[in-house]
Every structure is written in structure tokens, then in C-alpha cells.
A protein has these predicted regions:
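Structural motif
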Residues: 61-63, 85, 141
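Phosphate-binding/switch region of NTP-binding enzymes
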Residues: 129, 136-179
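Short, solvent-exposed amphipathic alpha-helical segments in soluble enzyme
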Residues: 75-77, 126, 155
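Phosphate-binding/switch loop-helix module in NTP-utilizing enzymes
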Residues: 87-139
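Short, well-ordered secondary-structure micro-motifs
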Residues: 70-71, 95, 121, 149-152
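Conserved nucleotide-binding/hydrolysis micro-motifs of P-loop NTPases
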Residues: 64-67, 88-91, 115-117, 144-148, ...
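The Walker A/P-loop phosphate-binding site
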Residues: 1-79, 91-102
Length: 179
């Protein structure tokens, strides 16, 4: 008998939910790895908008400072309801994110390009522990060039995004999990 599936939040995208066997897993990070300019931030913001419509409070840390409320709104998010974490805080930004998860203020944390913070991997450990002990979600965008970077948080679901396959008729070849 297979182990029971952890709770998940449907994304609202049928093929994506089928691929994830029900939706985004609670208490776990999902890393989207793809080349720069491939649409991973747009995809993650649209997934966040779907979660927001289902009642989750969204916190967003755009480490490179490139995300604007206008862009978030264009992807379906209500920017006035988003908890924006200032990347200029550096390591303190991770502490803010960790507290939002630990105190159940946010049900979804989006980390856009967290490598741009320039922090060592061990700085992400408290955030990883807070996520594991909650039912929150964490969506992470990271670049993928000729290598796959080491995970930032413990036990993430890592997905490679293949932009050249997005035009596929069923859309299923656009994502591949990393084992």
C-alpha cells in the first residue's frame, strides 16, 4: 500500500495538477529551474495568483528586486494583498519570511531568484524548518544554465522547465522532475 499523499493545493491548471498528482504539496518547496527569460517567474506568479484566489495569503521575496506590483497584477495577483519582503534586508529578509511561515501569516511564500541575495546555503535552514513544520507552500525560481544548482531548502520538489516544449499539444513535456 503506497504511503498517503500529503495535502496539496490545486493550481487551477488541469495538466499541471495532473503532473503534480493533485496540486502543489503543502509543507514543501517547489523549485522551478529554467534558463533566464524562459517564463519561470511568470509561471510561478500565475500559480501564486491561483493560490491567492483559493484563500492563501501570499508573501513574495524577489531577491533581485525586479518584480513590481504592476507585473504581479498583470499575472493575476492582487498586489495590495501580497506581503512584499524587501530584498535589501539581506539575511533578515529570510528571517521575515521564516516568521511569516512559522506564525502562519502566509500560506504561500514565493522566492524569486533567491541566489541573488548572495547568502550561503546554511542561511536558508531556519526557513526550511519553518516550511517543514507548516502546511504552507514555497515556490522558488532559480536559473539553470549548464548545471543544476544544489537545493536551497530541504527536500524540494525540483522541476526543470523546458520552454521549447511549452508549445506541445498536451503541455506535459514542458516539465520534468529532477530525481
Amino acid at each position: 500500500m503506497p504511503p498517503p499523499r500529503p495535502p496539496c493545493h490545486p493550481t487551477g491548471f488541469r495538466h499541471f495538477d495532473e503532473f503534480l498528482e493533485g496540486g502543489l504539496p503543502c509543507g514543501r518547496a517547489v523549485e522551478f529551474l529554467a534558463p533566464p527569460g524562459s517564463g519561470k517567474t511568470t509561471l510561478v506568479l500565475r500559480l501564486a495568483a491561483a493560490c491567492q484566489r483559493h484563500g492563501l495569503r501570499v508573501a513574495l521575496l524577489a531577491a533581485d528586486g525586479s518584480l513590481t506590483p504592476a507585473y504581479a497584477k498583470a499575472q493575476g495577483l492582487d498586489p495590495a494583498a501580497v506581503l512584499w519582503i524587501d530584498p535589501a534586508l539581506g539575511e533578515r529578509a529570510l528571517s521575515v519570511a521564516q516568521r511569516l511561515l512559522a506564525e502562519q501569516v502566509a500560506g504561500l511564500l514565493v522566492l524569486d531568484a533567491p541566489d541573488a541575495l548572495g547568502l550561503p546555503r546554511h542561511a536558508f535552514r531556519p526557513l526550511s524548518r519553518a516550511l517543514a513544520s507548516s502546511q504552507a507552500l514555497c515556490l522558488i525560481t532559480r536559473p539553470r544554465a549548464s548545471f543544476t544548482p544544489a537545493p536551497l531548502l530541504r527536500n524540494p520538489l525540483r522541476l526543470l522547465l523546458y520552454p521549447e516544449a511549452i508549445e506541445a499539444s498536451n503541455g506535459r513535456r514542458a516539465l520534468r522532475p529532477i530525481k
